[in-house]
């Protein structure tokens, strides 16, 4: 008796955008809303079989993504439009597929990634915003963006980020390699743009929290370098809120030839 022939398995990568303000983070959890759960449900409807996704970076509750990357495996052969338009039709309005690409067997959304890039958006005005209030962090004291930028440059390179690491972080090492960190002002908005090979838990938000203290002239420019050298989380500022944080890009080796989309969010140029 001949063995039953198994259907071929396809590996698919997707670019995902989402407003995380109504979700308890990316990762699927029991009895709470997660981005992963909504995406897997929509994909399973299109594939007509259960689908599990793996992401490049598991964002926390309230954090957004314009450049999240996921992959999944399926025996369902579908046109690209099914994985984009079809999946989007089954997703809530605050989650969307941006692109689709068939990938080789050795691709992994998390482990194949070589760098992640985040942007943190601060609405720097005396009064809080009503529009996009869950997409920015409001800070009412005047911020000196140029001062923040200068102070942040000491973080570039491979460093021990213990001072900017959440106490509950489960990473085996606090060492990370920061490729760039830029702070710029766009009218009432201050944008912190940071790229690294990977990030320890709450690293971006802890860095931003301390940079805001420097920008408000509550601490000297040298304070960030002092915190980095101290390797003590208790000395740095409070963690900045989740609302202003966006995962905007994930880098992969060129051989995977993944699509490039505008980083955003919204009007922000690349």
From Swiss-Prot:
SUPFAM superfamilies, per database record: Pseudouridine synthase
Segments of this protein annotated with the region Interaction with tRNA: 168-172
InterPro entries, per database record: PsdUridine_synth_cat_dom_sf (IPR020103), PsdUridine_synth_TruA (IPR001406), PsdUridine_synth_TruA_a/b_dom (IPR020097), PsdUridine_synth_TruA_C (IPR020095), TruA/RsuA/RluB/E/F_N (IPR020094)
EC number(s) from the headed UniProt entry: 5.4.99.12
Pfam families from the UniProt entry: PseudoU_synth_1 (PF01416)
GO molecular function: RNA binding; tRNA pseudouridine(38-40) synthase activity
Binding site for substrate: 118
Positions bearing the site annotation: Interaction with tRNA: 58, 78, 110, 126, 139
Catalytic center residues: 60
Gene Ontology terms: biological process: tRNA pseudouridine synthesis
Keywords associated with the record: Isomerase, tRNA processing
Region (RNA binding): 107-111
Domain of life: Bacteria
Catalyses which reaction(s): uridine(38/39/40) in tRNA = pseudouridine(38/39/40) in tRNA
Enzyme class: isomerase
Subunit and partners: Homodimer.
Function, as annotated: Formation of pseudouridine at positions 38, 39 and 40 in the anticodon stem and loop of transfer RNAs.
Family as reported in the entry's similarity comment: Belongs to the tRNA pseudouridine synthase TruA family.
Name of the protein in question: tRNA pseudouridine synthase A
Lineage of producing organism: Bacteria, Pseudomonadati, Pseudomonadota, Gammaproteobacteria, Enterobacterales
């Amino acid at each position: 008796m001949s063995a039953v022939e198994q259907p071929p398995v396809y590996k698919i990568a997707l670019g995902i955008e989402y407003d995380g303000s109504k979700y308890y983070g990316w990762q699927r959890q029991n009895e709470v809303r997660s981005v992963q759960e909504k995406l897997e449900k929509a994909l399973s409807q299109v594939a007509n079989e259960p689908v599990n996704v793996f992401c490049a970076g598991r964002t926390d509750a309230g954090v957004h993504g314009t450049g999240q990357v996921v992959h999944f495996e399926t025996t369902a052969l579908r046109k690209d439009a099914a994985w984009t338009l079809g999946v989007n039709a089954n997703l809530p309005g605050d989650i969307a597929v941006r692109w689709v690409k068939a990938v080789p067997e050795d691709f992994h959304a998390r482990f194949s990634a070589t760098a992640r890039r985040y942007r943190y958006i601060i609405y720097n005005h005396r009064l809080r915003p009503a529009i996009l209030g869950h997409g920015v962090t409001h800070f009412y004291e005047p911020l000196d963006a140029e001062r923040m930028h200068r102070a942040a440059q000491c973080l570039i390179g491979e460093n021990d980020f213990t001072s900017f690491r959440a106490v509950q972080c489960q990473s085996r090492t606090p060492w990370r390699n920061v490729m760039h960190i830029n702070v710029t002002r766009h009218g009432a908005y201050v944008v912190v743009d940071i790229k690294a090979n990977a990030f320890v838990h709450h690293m971006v938000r802890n860095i931003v929290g301390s940079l805001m203290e420097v920008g408000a002239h509550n601490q000297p420019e040298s304070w960030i370098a002092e915190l980095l050298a101290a390797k003590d989380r208790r000395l740095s500022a409070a963690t900045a809120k989740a609302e202003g944080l966006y995962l905007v890009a994930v880098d992969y080796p060129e051989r995977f030839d993944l699509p490039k989309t505008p980083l955003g969010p919204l009007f922000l140029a690349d």
